[in-house]
A protein has these predicted regions:
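Conserved acyl-donor/pantetheine-binding loop and adjacent beta-alpha core of acyl/acetyltransferases
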Residues: 69-107, 113
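Conserved catalytic-core motifs of GNAT/GCN5-like acyltransferases
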Residues: 140-142, 160-174
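Conserved GNAT acetyl-CoA-binding A-motif
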Residues: 103-105, 129-144
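Conserved beta-strand-loop-alpha-helix junction that forms the acyl-donor binding cleft
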Residues: 108-112, 138-151
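A short beta-loop-alpha structural element at the N-terminal edge
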Residues: 3-18
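A short helix-loop-beta-strand connector motif used in the catalytic cores of GNAT acetyltransferases and
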Residues: 44-57, 73-80
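Conserved acetyl-CoA-binding loop-helix of GNAT-fold acetyltransferases
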Residues: 107-130
Length: 210
């Protein structure tokens, strides 16, 4: 098995939508929901992410098996996420983090059976993001579905839960999400402890083969 991790191209957006639509999530009542992220993402949205933000894809024999997206500060500040930050239930003083050096982990989606690849792609994404950003925020949905895909990596990278937010969307109703923060200086310490730093420094981002 030959796995490549590379920058996403505009033409990859079609495969990304297909992966999103194959994802399944466990509802808190024990049932399973299929069809991708709760609120969905359009082909055009993925193309915009690819053009403007940090977006990596993983391939197995040239077939895309997963992807990750981090929004740069410019995109974040123009998003609904940024507008809604004052509606969140914070466990920290959020004003200390409202700076140009904040980015946001938007999506992580993989087909089943590629756990190790997920972690490696996430490390690559954070390496890119922390070249120009000091703090990374992300949210994970806790109700009405459980989206736990990113939590193992968040914990490995030194992330911590720092709040929650309740949102109401006409198409789905009430959504509850936990908010996490990964700070660059803590991430660097965790990376050094993991022993992966030399590997990430040595291999170009354009192509990761393992």
């Amino acid at each position: 098995m030959k796995i490549n991790i590379r920058y996403a191209k505009l033409e990859d957006a079609v495969a990304m939508v297909a992966i999103k639509n194959r994802l399944s999530f466990k509802n808190i009542n024990g049932t399973t929901t299929t069809g991708g992220f709760l609120l969905g993402t359009t082909l055009q949205t993925y193309q915009e992410y690819i053009a403007n933000d940090y977006c990596l894809v993983a391939e197995n024999e040239y077939q895309i098996i997963g992807f990750g997206i981090i929004l740069k500060n410019t995109t974040l500040q123009q998003s609904d996420i940024w507008t809604k930050r004052h509606a969140a239930n914070w466990e920290i003083d959020i004003t200390k983090y409202e700076s140009p050096n904040v980015c946001y982990f938007e999506q992580l989606a993989f087909l089943r059976g590629y756990t190790r690849v997920v972690i490696r792609l996430c490390y690559q994404l954070l390496q890119l993001a922390f070249n120009t950003h000091d703090n990374l925020f992300t949210t994970t949905v806790s109700s009405p579905i459980l989206n736990l895909a990113a939590i193992p990596f968040i914990e490995k990278a030194g992330g911590r839960k720092i709040g929650s937010i309740n949102e109401v969307y006409p198409e789905v109703g009430l959504i509850l999400s936990d908010i996490y923060l990964i700070e660059k200086h803590i991430y660097i310490k965790r990376l050094e402890q993991s022993g992966l730093q030399p590997l990430l420094n040595r291999i170009p981002y354009e192509l990761q083969i393992f």
